[in-house]
Amino acid sequence: MDQKFYISSLLQEDTPSKEKPETSSESPIPTGSECSLNESSDTTLDQKMEPNKKMFNGTLDFNPWICHVSQQLAAQLSQNGKNRPGAPNQVPLLNMNVNQTMGNMWDPRLSWLYPYMSKSPQKRKGGQIRFTNEQTDALEHKFDSHKYLSPQERKKLAKSLSLSERQVKTWFQNRRAKWRRVRKDGEDEDEMPNGASARSLGQLQSSNPFLSHG
């Protein structure tokens, strides 16, 4: 009896105890295969996270920790989007229109890049000041009577034509230069026939000695 009891005691000690495994309340971390399956089920999230995969040089599919954190973040963002009324069922931060964002970024620069868009037609174009027909006619009419303007007359004329005093002064300077050039060209044309006749007569006398003694 003692020996049998002793053997049974040994067998009982050698037999592994059938204890229930401890259950953990924490959710297990998904492995790489589970992560890839969950990502493939959500095509929208997979497409949006494609640039992030390239940033990690392909390590995102094989790192369960990064995959687990990414899934939790995406789930939280999706849940926040569902709680908002009228919000689409996708990640709000990843659903951004890139073209619209770039357009809004460039809008404040338009006035700085293209200052000529806000200028009136008589402003500079091609390096020259453009005047309207009414302004040109008024300036020509004033130039016919006054080749030079006093500061008071220039200020009054500029105000009546919606121009600056500098523009009026520059126009009169250019107009006087053109007027002198036209006058000089006209005087040269008037002198050309007389000069040509004198030269012709001199050549004729030198070629015919009898005319020189007449």
UniProtKB/Swiss-Prot annotation:
Q: What is its main location?
A: nucleus
* Keyword check for Mitochondrion: no
**Under the GO molecular function aspect, what terms does this record hold?**
DNA-binding transcription factor activity, RNA polymerase II-specific; RNA polymerase II cis-regulatory region sequence-specific DNA binding
Localized where? Nucleus
Instruction: Give the record's keywords alphabetically.
Output: DNA-binding, Homeobox, Nucleus, Transcription, Transcription regulation
The stretch of residues making up the signal peptide is none
Annotated DNA-binding residue span(s): 124-183
Q: Which Gene3D superfamilies match?
A: Homeodomain-like (1.10.10.60)
Q: Which GO terms describe its biological process?
A: actin cytoskeleton organization; animal organ morphogenesis; cell differentiation; eating behavior; muscle cell fate specification; nematode larval development; nematode pharyngeal gland morphogenesis; nematode pharyngeal muscle development
- Identify the SUPFAM superfamilies for this entry: Homeodomain-like (SSF46689)
- Give start-end positions of Low complexity composition bias: 24-34
Tell me the segments the record calls region Disordered: 1-50, 180-214
An example GO CC term for this entry is:
nucleus
Question: Which domain of life, per UniProt?
Answer: Eukaryota
**UniProt feature, compositional bias: Polar residues:** 35-44, 200-214
Q: Which PANTHER family match?
A: HEMATOPOIETICALLY-EXPRESSED HOMEOBOX PROTEIN HHEX, HOMEOBOX PROTEIN HHEX
Name the job this protein performs.
Answer: Transcriptional repressor. Involved in pharyngeal development and required for the formation of the pharyngeal isthmus. Plays a role in modulating cytoskeleton in the muscle cells of the isthmus. Regulates expression of the acetylcholinesterase genes ace-1 and ace-2. May regulate its own expression.
Q: What protein is this chain from?
A: Homeobox protein HEX homolog pha-2
Q: State the species of origin.
A: Caenorhabditis elegans
> Taxonomic classification, please?
Eukaryota, Metazoa, Ecdysozoa, Nematoda, Chromadorea
Give me the gene this protein comes from: pha-2
